[in-house]
């Protein structure tokens, strides 16, 4: 569903932006 590069990038963002926790959980 999500390209690995984008997925990895989102995970990195999740570590720094807690407000994305819900989006991160969906990954």
From Swiss-Prot:
Keyword field: Disulfide bond, Secreted, Toxin
Transmembrane intervals: none
GO biological process, one term: venom-mediated perturbation of biological process
Keyword Iron: no
Major location (coarse): secreted
UniProt key word NAD: no
Other information: Electrospray ionization experiments give a mass of 6598.6 Da for DELTA-pseudomyrmecitoxin-Pp1a heterodimer (subunits A+B).
Subunit text: Heterodimer composed of subunit A and subunit B (DELTA-PSDTX-Pp1a); disulfide-linked.
Protein name: DELTA-pseudomyrmecitoxin-Pp1a subunit A
Lineage, highest ranks first: Eukaryota, Metazoa, Ecdysozoa, Arthropoda, Hexapoda
